[in-house]
């Protein structure tokens, strides 16, 4: 009995240690920034003029080999420094005409806070407190973007909005220089299905929100009417400062992973943290690939053509900003001819299935940690259940039942072993009284008793340990999946991804652990018995800050376990009565 309990306690301690170790390795970040005040009633509008930190050229722009040393680019007469506003049903963004970069972007379908649904989460920003933007351009001989300055693009309007009934929106920026005309074309898609109700759209019901609407197709159309050939390279990159992740407030108050990731020839998913970039830059030539910046629940990624050979790299500019991007192959346009190049920008939630379709390996940005091979099928099953029930809380309950059925034989073996141990508890107590403090003789006598009664002292422990990886995998599923963000269950549980605001579920969980403990055999060691009695209290304390969805899983699992264990225990005790008569 001592061996069984000791192994179980040590195993739980080891698992907890590994969990904390992995968490620190993957998610340890700097302290979070203070939350932006939302005391005003209306959503604050994006500013119409770019911040002073907007790029006008410098070491944040990659330098092409053939780039000439020239004076700063002269803007066209009709160009303006005023930001160009673009609004679709899922994106609200601003483009800086200097360089044509997306410097601000909001997600109207993802409120920053649940109690303020009118304030959308802001992904990109280029203000005095935070720098995070998506840059792209053309570099090389006679190309418009140089380290000495960026092109100043023109547009027909200063504001574009996708109208009702409109399925797409195209925003063209124009620029001309040295007989070459350029169009930088942003193409957007409608995301919300008008056949769905506003509530169904808000809950992200299947078929109500098109994930591809978070993709922005960025194309460069080049019309070379000069008398010489034109050559240039497309570059696209994400630039960010070292400010904290505004979306990373988790149930435990711990910051999740914030950093770059990219596809390489050797690794379909390579994380490059800010610390890694501080130490050294990274460069590699790949076929296709992608580059991304990760934060809790959301990801931005540049995806070039899968058929192109690209130089992917990470670096740090002189202003301390971190950059991850790629430079494409040279584009040649003969005199009097036209050419084009481009890439896809994804800026939105971490939607695993869609990201995998967009580019191989991009689905791994939904980072489930070292148990991803268990977490991915668990999430798939959870998503299937949600498609039938339409509520993530009830889906977790059904998932718990299914997992319990899968592990039913193992659990039954564990409970049978515990029931037999419970039945021989009086004999164990007698052995303790017989041998006193002689632990060696006590252990030998216990082993002989286990052998005589055909009891495996590890029988109640190992089945529980087998289930621990599933529990940890589910933990990461609930933590990392954006589908759980602000997902309600019922009554007071309005967000399954954060802690229970009234701590009701953790208290219920502690009560179920206490009840289940009464069904287990009492260890002969009084000190061990006292420690085990404290376990429900200790677990309740730690679970106070766990995601409500995870605590819900544990509560339902405990209730099912109590029923199963009670039935098996009573059955074995009933069978033992005639034998003892």
Curated annotation (Swiss-Prot):
Residues covered by region (Disordered): 41-62
Subcellular location: Cell inner membrane
Pfam families recorded: 60KD_IMP, YidC_periplas
Keywords noted in UniProt: Cell inner membrane, Cell membrane, Chaperone, Membrane, Protein transport, Transmembrane, Transmembrane helix, Transport
Gene3D superfamilies, per the entry: 2.70.98.90
Cystine bridges: none
CDD domains: 5TM_YidC_Alb3, EcYidC-like_peri
UniProt cross-references to InterPro entries, sorted A to Z: Membr_insert_YidC (IPR019998), Membr_insert_YidC_N (IPR028053), YidC/ALB3/OXA1/COX18 (IPR001708), YidC/Oxa/ALB_C (IPR028055), YidC_ALB_C (IPR047196), YidC_periplasmic_sf (IPR038221)
GO BP annotation list: protein insertion into membrane; protein transport
GO cellular component: plasma membrane
Parts of the chain that traverse the membrane: 7-27, 365-385, 388-408, 458-478, 489-509, 536-556
Entry membrane topology: Multi-pass membrane protein
GO molecular function: membrane insertase activity
rRNA-binding recorded as keyword: no
Biological function: Required for the insertion and/or proper folding and/or complex formation of integral membrane proteins into the membrane. Involved in integration of membrane proteins that insert both dependently and independently of the Sec translocase complex, as well as at least some lipoproteins. Aids folding of multispanning membrane proteins.
Protein family per UniProt: Belongs to the OXA1/ALB3/YidC family. Type 1 subfamily.
NCBIfam families assigned to the protein according to its UniProt record, in alphabetical order: PRK01318.1-3 (NF002352), yidC_nterm (TIGR03593), yidC_oxa1_cterm (TIGR03592)
PANTHER family to which the protein is assigned, alphabetical: CYTOCHROME C OXIDASE ASSEMBLY PROTEIN COX18, MITOCHONDRIAL (PTHR12428:SF65), OXA1 (PTHR12428)
Assembly notes: Interacts with the Sec translocase complex via SecD. Specifically interacts with transmembrane segments of nascent integral membrane proteins during membrane integration.
Record-given protein name: Membrane protein insertase YidC
